[in-house]
UniProtKB/Swiss-Prot annotation:
Keywords, comma-separated and alphabetical: Glycoprotein, GPI-anchor, Lipoprotein, Membrane, Palmitate, Signal
Lipoprotein is among the record's keywords: yes
Protein known as: Uncharacterized lipoprotein MPN_439
One GO location term (cellular component): side of membrane
Source organism (scientific name): Mycoplasma pneumoniae (strain ATCC 29342 / M129 / Subtype 1)
Chief place where the protein resides: membrane
Chain residues carrying a lipid of type N-palmitoyl cysteine: 28
Record's keyword annotation contains Amino-acid biosynthesis: no
Family named by the database record: Belongs to the MG307/MG309/MG338 family.
Residues in the signal sequence: 1-27
One family name in Pfam for this protein: DUF3713
Length: 237
């Protein structure tokens, strides 16, 4: 698992939200009530039964909805994020996970205290007003909150620094550059994401993720500005 956590493509698979990866990952996920309701609507054409009542058709229907898709992916992604934070060599990152879990515990206590009800019906109101919309239990409520905070922090860490640079003859430079150098198509292959000038523990990992994100963007969006760039792909059609 630790080796996978260091592979940028592993994180792109999880963070990309692609339908194929979502279907695979959803096998490990626990859908919330709202996710299930997106599939099982008696008055909706999304409802399935009879000859068409298969798990595959239900999953396919659910994953067509962006919000439901995110909820299916969230559970396995949270496990990966927790493992990355917990096993990180940067002690500030491992401490962030501990602090965040403590914060989530405190948040739960606060929101439970704010639920208005008669003392004898407290647990019922907590279930209906708080937990049912977040997976149905205290554990799923906390997992959702933990995921929201970890994914936000992880994304900010990945893009906190700009690793874009120019590498020629083994030498890496962050600029400034002459226009004539950058404007030549033949030099575009020298544009890289490199952490050679950044000494912190996770810089190389973050630089590789930025590089993968850029490659995915260039491959799938066919941006006009780089329509003739070959890099490691052929020119887009």
């Amino acid at each position: 698992m630790k080796s996978f956590l260091r592979k940028p493509k592993f994180w792109l698979l999880l963070l990309g939200g692609l339908s194929t990866s979502s279907i695979i990952l959803s096998a490990c996920a626990t859908p919330s009530n709202s996710a299930l309701q997106a599939v099982f609507k008696p008055t909706s054409n999304q409802f399935f039964n009879g000859e068409h009542g298969t798990i595959q058709s239900a999953l396919n229907t659910a994953l067509r909805d962006p919000e439901t898709n995110k909820k299916f992916v969230a559970a396995p992604l949270l496990k990966a994020l927790e493992a990355w934070y917990e096993n990180n060599q940067d002690k500030n990152i491992t401490q962030f996970l501990k602090d965040t879990k403590t914060n989530v515990d405190n948040q739960y206590k606060t929101v439970v205290d704010k639920v208005v009800s008669a003392p004898r019906n407290k647990s019922l109101f907590v279930q209906q007003d708080l937990l049912d919309s977040s997976g149905g239990s205290e554990a799923t409520w906390k997992a959702r909150k933990l995921f929201e905070q970890l994914i936000s922090d992880f994304a900010s860490r990945v893009f906190q620094k700009n690793y874009l640079s120019y590498k020629e003859n083994g030498k890496v430079s962050a600029g400034p550059f002459l226009y004539d150098t950058i404007s030549k198509n033949s030099n575009w292959q020298n544009i890289v994401f490199d952490a050679v000038n950044f000494p912190e523990t996770n810089d190389d990992f973050f630089a590789k993720i930025q590089s993968e994100v850029f490659d995915q963007w260039a491959e799938y969006t066919d941006p006009t500005i780089i329509s003739s760039v070959t890099l490691k792909y052929s020119a887009p059609n």
